[in-house]
Design a protein with these regions (language model features):
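Alpha-helical transmembrane segments and their membrane-interface boundaries
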Residues: 1-81, 86, 90-96, 100, ...
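Generic structural marker for isolated residues within well-ordered, non-membrane alpha-helices
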Residues: 23, 106, 124
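Transmembrane helix boundary and interhelical junction motifs in multipass membrane proteins
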Residues: 35-40, 117-123
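Membrane-helix interface "capping/anchor" motifs
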Residues: 51-60, 109-120
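Generic transmembrane alpha-helix signature in multi-pass membrane proteins
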Residues: 75, 109-113, 122-129
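Short acidic, glycine/Ser/Thr-rich loop/turn "cap" segments at secondary-structure junctions
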Residues: 88-91, 106-112
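Membrane-embedded alpha-helical segments that form the functional core of polytopic membrane enzymes
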Residues: 101, 105
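Juxtamembrane/interfacial segments flanking transmembrane helices
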Residues: 114-122, 159-164
Length: 177
């Protein structure tokens, strides 16, 4: 059992390190925020639990896409200014309401369409509170997911670990009351 944990730790170390190095280098090359906080959590899932539906590229791309879209709409609707320190703004309540509404809607949408990806919740908050925003930032978020998926595929191919691109919708259904 310890050998399996060592192999998993090694795969996480190599995969996460390589993915962040590639995404970071591309971020510098194109002067765009490809290396944003939630992509680190996505990378961990890709290399720690590659067979899980929440780790597959389908869920990562659609989850982050839903989060970015809903976060953008909430920020626009509530007048949250992108790239403004929301706690220092004159009306910080706007960002709080934007975050609450956006995460509720994005979470429900991911659950409804069976594309759950927990790090996408962080993306939703990042965009809804104005830390990132605008078409260029949204493109960077989705571009980073594509690059992460490609690095994940490459690393898993060399390791012999299966990494499905499009996992079937098998996220467990929550229990009914």
């Amino acid at each position: 059992m310890a050998a399996n944990r060592t192999a998993a730790a090694t795969l996480c170390f190599i995969g996460c390190g390589l993915a962040m190095a590639v995404i970071g280098a591309l971020s510098l090359a194109v002067s765009s925020p490809l290396l944003f906080p939630a992509i680190g959590a996505s990378a961990f899932l890709v290399f720690y639990a590659p067979r899980s539906p929440i780790s597959c590229p389908r869920n990562a791309f659609l989850g982050h896409g839903i989060g970015a879209l809903v976060g953008t709409l909430a920020a626009l609707a509530l007048g949250v200014v992108a790239h403004e320190a929301w706690l220092l703004s004159t009306e910080p309540w706007r960002a709080v309401v934007s975050a609450a509404v956006a995460l509720a809607v994005a979470g429900a949408a991911m659950a409804r369409f069976d594309v759950g990806h927990p790090p996408a919740g962080a993306t939703t908050l990042i965009v809804a509170t104005g830390l990132m925003g605008g078409a260029r930032d949204i493109a960077a978020i989705l571009g980073a997911v594509v690059v992460l998926s490609a690095v994940g595929r490459l690393v898993h191919r060399f390791s012999g670990e299966p990494f499905p691109w499009w996992a079937p919708g098998t996220v467990p259904t929550p229990p009914r009351a």
